[in-house]
Amino acid sequence: MRLKKLKVWGFMAVVFVMLAVLVMPSGQARAAEKTTSLVIATATTGGTYYPMGVGMASLWSIQLAKKHGIMVQAITSAGSGENVNMLRGKEVDLAILQGLFGKSAWKGLGTYKDKPLKTIRSITMLWPNVEHFVVLANKVKTGNPSDIKGLRFSLGRAGSGTERSGLTIMSALGMNRDSVKGEYLGYFESSKAMKDKRIGGANIPAGPPVAAITDLFATPGLKVKVLEFTDEQLKKINETTAYPGYRYVIKAGTYPGQKKDIRTIAQPNLLVCSEDVSEEVVYLLTKALFENPDYLRAVHKMGTFITIDNALSGLPAPLHPGALKFYKEKGLEIPKALIPQK
């Protein structure tokens, strides 16, 4: 089942590492005879999860295959919702999740009421998942998310993290699924539908710059606007839902022709894993991630957020013992709630 979802870049990374193993000195080859193959779930193409997930998989495979026999493959998915399901079904070993899904799955909230996922463990906070409620400029009335009412609007793929987080935000602002004429499209599908004027807007949350949003801003003759959240709206979202939101400003110039800052909101993205992954493996994954910062920064601008200082921010579930070991070595003070129970 896993291999059906394996994408070419993850495959190429694994092939590259396997070739490197074949040509290494025999002593090193013997050291890596025991192979650990892992799968990390990302999301659809056009956002940030997929390129960053592929980047992490490639980094880990390149850094850890020779000496430790660890190889990692990145797969696409419908996003956080499917990623939680795949972790529950033990189809994947690692996953990128929105903070909303990590918190809800661990605590048994919302969709996961009466069925919490207590086998997930936190590794690190990654980067902010920034809300991009984008609409055609001629559909703008107030400039905030209430403008999506009545529009033919892409909520994201059915069952995706995009759909769930968007509906959660909408519920806090007095809207629901019936408030829009819903379409269920991936990121690039949404941008294409907006360019073709088949829909009036879309929810495309990711770390900026988001490829699908850049595509919209760069299209000649097309005028779009990313809607802004008021302080009151952010307060309502945090007070009435499990969405762990905070203010985020998309700086002017992030997108082609963007002349002003955009005041939106964000939630943390998380790297989590199954408790079944060994302590030594997770320790090595965590160590490689933080000791090679330039690698992921070259993949995407959001790689700059992956730092030791940010590592424990917004984590909903206890740390995996392997990650805990690394952070203790670095002298981090670990909150009691993040210390795994033995």
Predicted features, each with a name:
Residues E189, A206-V226, N238-E239, E280-K342:
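An extracytoplasmic/periplasmic, membrane-proximal ligand-sensing/linker region
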Residues A32-S104:
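N-terminal (or domain-start) structured segment
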Residues G150-T168, T241-L315:
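Ligand-binding clefts/hinges and TM-proximal coupling segments of bilobed small-molecule sensing domains
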Residues S37-Q63, Q73, N129-D196, S313, ...:
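Bilobed "Venus flytrap"/periplasmic-binding protein-like clamshell domains
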Residues M1-T36, Q341-K342:
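Short, low-complexity disordered leader/linker segments with a strong preference
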Residues V92-W127, G207-A212:
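Acidic, polar ligand-binding/catalytic clefts
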Residues G99-F101, L109-T111, A137-K139, N176-V272, ...:
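Pocket-lining segment of extracytoplasmic ligand-binding domains
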Residues D114-L126, E131-H132, G253-I262:
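A structural signal for short loop-to-beta-strand junctions that line the ligand-binding cleft
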